[in-house]
């Protein structure tokens, strides 16, 4: 069996399937009454996941080592991780919006790996002595899975902001809510609130931070119950995916420190990759701290997770391509 030819076919097939799957998910949002779109999208993600798993398996058989030693391999491992976390998130939520957010990212990763990287970066090569260690699988695979979970969680936070138009909302279970959906309204003039509220309560309601019965205004459109239910689902699912990715990131950083100490005699050298991994850890630690101890929900943690989305990409790809250090792939410099 020609493993190189098989890999070439599988990486192009993965890209093609993900591209079609992205269109299917977007079509499902545009035409929600067509019943087979969600099932077709899930099937497409599962097929792409299987194709990339076979690609990585063939790569492993060809090179004789776990295939996460260069940019091409790590990109497909990341895309495989994103599709795996997607399938978990979609199973938990049953929402077609999950695929509409994650499929374009998975497709973009596969396209970059299959169509943009030079041929010499796509070919398998013997490992350098420093990488011939069991820590390669332990450290890098866990880091890549953490990136996958954090990326999916951040994408769901971005989807939450889109669904709510970036408006402040109080969700079920909020530390400041009462167990029902409420939208925070700007302070309305007394003339407009008098027609909706009892005269004896109008002065108190003018200073309240939330109105139990929202008043539609040009600045603050009211939301339907379905939209608010979707927003709550996205907020909760984003929290759970980031809650999955953060421990993996922690374990991956610790494993990397142990490996570095074994290979170079120092657990931490402030390499650009190490520095940005620490920044990523701090961003998502702040996210979880705000949610767990401060009771944040909705817009504020979603903005923090959105920032974390870009930090993850700088940590993974930006530093590797542009930075100087032990983790640089040296494509641009």
From Swiss-Prot:
GO terms for molecular function: heme binding. The keyword Manganese does not apply. It comes from the Bacteria. This is Cytochrome c biogenesis protein CcsA. GO terms for biological process: cytochrome complex assembly. The lineage of its organism: Bacteria, Bacillati, Cyanobacteriota, Cyanophyceae, Acaryochloridales. One of its GO terms (cellular component) is plasma membrane-derived thylakoid membrane. Belongs to the CcmF/CycK/Ccl1/NrfE/CcsA family. It is a multi-pass membrane protein. May interact with ccs1. Required during biogenesis of c-type cytochromes (cytochrome c6 and cytochrome f) at the step of heme attachment. It holds the Pfam family Cytochrom_C_asm. The keyword Membrane applies. Its main location: membrane.
């Amino acid at each position: 069996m020609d493993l190189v030819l098989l890999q070439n076919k599988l990486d192009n097939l993965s890209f093609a399937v993900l591209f079609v799957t992205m269109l299917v998910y977007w079509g499902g949002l545009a035409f929600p009454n067509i019943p087979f779109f969600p099932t077709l999208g899930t099937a497409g993600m599962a097929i792409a996941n299987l194709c990339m798993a076979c690609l990585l398996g063939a790569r492993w058989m060809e090179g004789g080592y776990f295939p996460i030693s260069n940019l091409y391999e790590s990109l497909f491992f990341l895309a495989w991780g994103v599709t795996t976390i997607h399938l978990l998130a979609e199973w938990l939520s049953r929402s077609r919006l999950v695929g509409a957010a994650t499929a374009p990212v998975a497709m973009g990763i596969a396209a970059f790996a299959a169509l943009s990287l030079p041929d010499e970066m796509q070919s398998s090569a013997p490992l350098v002595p420093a990488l011939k260690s069991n820590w390669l699988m332990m450290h890098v695979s866990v880091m890549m899975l953490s990136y996958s979970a954090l990326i999916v969680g951040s994408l769901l936070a971005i989807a939450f902001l889109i669904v709510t138009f970036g408006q402040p909302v109080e969700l079920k279970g909020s530390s400041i809510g009462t167990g029902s959906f409420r939208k925070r309204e700007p302070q309305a003039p007394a003339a407009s609130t008098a027609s909706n509220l009892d005269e004896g309560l109008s002065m108190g309601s003018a200073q309240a931070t939330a109105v139990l019965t929202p008043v539609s205004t040009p600045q603050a459109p009211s939301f339907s119950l379905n939209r608010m239910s979707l927003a709550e689902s996205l907020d909760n699912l984003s929290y759970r995916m980031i809650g999955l990715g953060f421990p993996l990131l922690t374990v991956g950083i610790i494993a990397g420190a142990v490996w570095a100490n074994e290979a170079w005699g120092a657990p931490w050298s402030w390499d650009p990759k190490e520095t940005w991994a620490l920044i990523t850890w701090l961003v998502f630690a702040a996210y979880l701290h705000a949610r767990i101890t401060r009771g944040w929900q909705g817009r504020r943690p979603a903005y923090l997770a959105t920032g974390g989305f870009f930090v993850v990409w700088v940590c993974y790809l930006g530093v590797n391509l542009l930075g100087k250090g032990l983790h640089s792939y040296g494509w641009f410099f």
